[in-house]
Design a protein with these regions (language model features):
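Alpha-helical multipass membrane-protein architecture
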Residues: 1-192
């Protein structure tokens, strides 16, 4: 199996990310920085390095990537090139907009969709991770937009996670499967 060492390699990558974060910045700022990341309204593009420092931003990226890896592993998703792309996207976008808290309502929404369809979550775990492209919307609604609150943020996240699996299947058909990032198109349609 060509990708059998993918999971250990990604774990090493996450440890490296966290270690570099601790070396480049002050380790005592990591937990307050993570808290600042979590409670920041993520409007448009929010640079976590600017908000909380390099240490907290890299540790956030490591945590989000580890959670993603754990979900893929527990769902028995066979590792492949697309798995690596998903993990790379999760790591990269965890530096701005996506954090260890705001991804959960969307993942839970996709889990509920799988249960409603009476199908294993493993079938939708990739869609779930890519759907977290809209995780900043959860933070925006939950934290500071004038009309939302925590419960509205969770509800919006659940709705996003529930709607994106069938929407992404539809956009895949529109594009004839030619685009690796068909979830980007689906997320864009839903975000509008």
């Amino acid at each position: 199996m060509r990708y059998k060492k993918l999971y250990p390699a990604v774990i090493c990558f996450c440890v490296f990310l966290a270690a570099i974060g601790l070396v480049l910045g002050d380790p005592s700022t990591v937990l307050p920085g993570l808290w600042k990341i979590i409670v920041t309204e993520d409007a448009l593009i929010t640079d976590y390095v600017k908000i909380a420092g390099v240490s907290a931003a890299l540790v956030n990226s490591a945590l989000v990537t580890l959670v993603s890896l754990l979900l893929l592993y527990l769902s028995k998703e066979p590792p492949n090139g697309f798995t690596l792309v998903e993990l790379g996207l999760m790591a990269g976008f965890s530096l701005f907009g996506k954090n260890i808290v705001n991804i959960w309502p969307i993942i839970a929404g996709t889990f509920l969709y799988a249960k409603a369809r009476r199908e294993p979550f493993g079938k939708y775990v990739s869609v779930s991770l890519l759907a977290t492209a809209l995780a900043p919307v959860v933070s925006y609604v939950a934290l500071d937009n004038g009309f939302g609150n925590l419960w509205w943020g969770i509800a919006v996240g659940l709705l996003i996670g529930f709607v994106l699996p069938p929407l992404s299947a539809y956009t895949y058909k529109i594009q004839n499967g030619m685009n690796l990032y068909n979830m980007g198109f689906a997320c864009g349609l839903l975000a509008m």
